[in-house]
Amino acid sequence: MPATPSLKVVHELPACTLCAGPLEDAVTIPCGHTFCRLCLPALSQMGAQSSGKILLCPLCQEEEQAETPMAPVPLGPLGETYCEEHGEKIYFFCENDAEFLCVFCREGPTHQAHTVGFLDEAIQPYRDRLRSRLEALSTERDEIEDVKCQEDQKLQVLLTQIESKKHQVETAFERLQQELEQQRCLLLARLRELEQQIWKERDEYITKVSEEVTRLGAQVKELEEKCQQPASELLQDVRVNQSRCEMKTFVSPEAISPDLVKKIRDFHRKILTLPEMMRMFSENLAHHLEIDSGVITLDPQTASRSLVLSEDRKSVRYTRQKKSLPDSPLRFDGLPAVLGFPGFSSGRHRWQVDLQLGDGGGCTVGVAGEGVRRKGEMGLSAEDGVWAVIISHQQCWASTSPGTDLPLSEIPRGVRVALDYEAGQVTLHNAQTQEPIFTFTASFSGKVFPFFAVWKKGSCLTLKG
């Protein structure tokens, strides 16, 4: 909208156009112009053709009879608008120039051909548009408030669910802790029971041996005394003495009974499996809850030209037609392999892959060291910096040197990998059956990366999560 220089807002009484003083006790003459009542005598002149007086407006030169009633002008509140050029109150609005006009502005040449109307009439379309916009804004505001209310309700539902899940987690782990504590107490009680049986059988053994030692001691003493007797006395009871001198075979009792030894041996075997059971439980729990250090993706800079990666870098498949890719010291060119990202130099990490084996093809899953060979023929063993399992339709084997055939109950269609850097372990499980596949032990130095390879058309590998 163009500027409106003809408009000013009056913050004090407007000035009279005759005396230039404050327009106090103002009156409006018939032509519509306003002056101070004290200035009216200056407007009076004798009419040329009448005996009466006339009022001559100095602004529009219109003549009126002096007897014509003059309307007092109630001065509006501070802030009324007046024409800056003529000092007159604003009554009109020019649609073409979007300007406020007084009487003189309306009659001037500038706005003769323009669409000019009274303020109340001109403002109505604008008021209608404003009301329409106001209704639209009110509707939009109401809709936003409704959406906000709905979202707040959803948020409250989610918060309630979270609070419920927190309680469930606390309850589950408290129950688990109680069960573990109960099992711990049972194991310790069983160990104490075995310990008491050992001490009991030891006491029984000592008692038997002590009794036999005492009996033999008494017999030795008796025989020593017999040896000191004269021949006549000794020969009197020769048959009795000879009977006493005969050696009786002493069956030495066992300190621990074979039955107790078997119980201890069986319990010892159970205890030996406890750490492995706890480790597997921890891994299964972490995997089930998807507690991991981050998302694993495939590194396109390392991918062989025989591999096609998905846009999200979560899936890779084999292709017979090698892709045209820039050469890089990081890229595998002898094996259809690719590394995962990121690499790890500490901590415990887990990831899972789903396998799709093509006809006569297969997949390799595991980890590889940062310095693994990328160019030309490469081996798959710990000496080559690779700890992985090779899976095909017919068999599965570990990349040891020499390779280790793995007689699994079924060929995995998904593999879960658990890396414990500090412990130097890489453990692989069947993701569907939880059956252990193989555990590598190593002494890592530098970063290790998730390692994957696929071969033959139709073979595909997809990272989960």
UniProtKB/Swiss-Prot annotation:
Zinc finger (RING-type): 16-61
Coiled coil: 126-229
Zinc fingers classed as B box-type: ranges: 78-119
EC supergroup of this enzyme: transferase
Catalytic activity, EC: 2.3.2.27
Keywords, ordered alphabetically: Cell junction, Coiled coil, Cytoplasm, Metal-binding, Nucleus, Transferase, Ubl conjugation pathway, Zinc, Zinc-finger
A GO biological process held by the record: positive regulation of DNA-binding transcription factor activity
Domain B30.2/SPRY: 276-465
Catalytic reactions of this protein: S-ubiquitinyl-[E2 ubiquitin-conjugating enzyme]-L-cysteine + [acceptor protein]-L-lysine = [E2 ubiquitin-conjugating enzyme]-L-cysteine + N(6)-ubiquitinyl-[acceptor protein]-L-lysine
Keyword Acyltransferase carried by entry: no
Main location: cytoplasm
GO MF annotations, alphabetized: molecular sequestering activity; transcription coactivator activity; ubiquitin protein ligase activity; zinc ion binding
Compartment annotation: Cytoplasm; Nucleus; Cell junction, Focal adhesion
Residues that coordinate or bind Zn(2+): 83, 86, 105, 111
InterPro entries assigned: B30.2/SPRY (IPR001870), B30.2/SPRY_sf (IPR043136), Butyrophylin_SPRY (IPR003879), ConA-like_dom_sf (IPR013320), PRY (IPR006574), SPRY_dom (IPR003877), TRIM/RBCC (IPR050143), Znf_B-box (IPR000315)
GO cellular component: cytoplasm; focal adhesion; nucleus
Assembly mode: Interacts with paxillin/PXN; this interaction recruits TRIM15 to focal adhesions. Interacts with TRIM8; this interaction prevents TRIM8 cytoplasmic translocation.
Family: Belongs to the TRIM/RBCC family.
Name listed for the protein in its UniProt record: E3 ubiquitin-protein ligase TRIM15
Species this protein is from: Homo sapiens (Human)
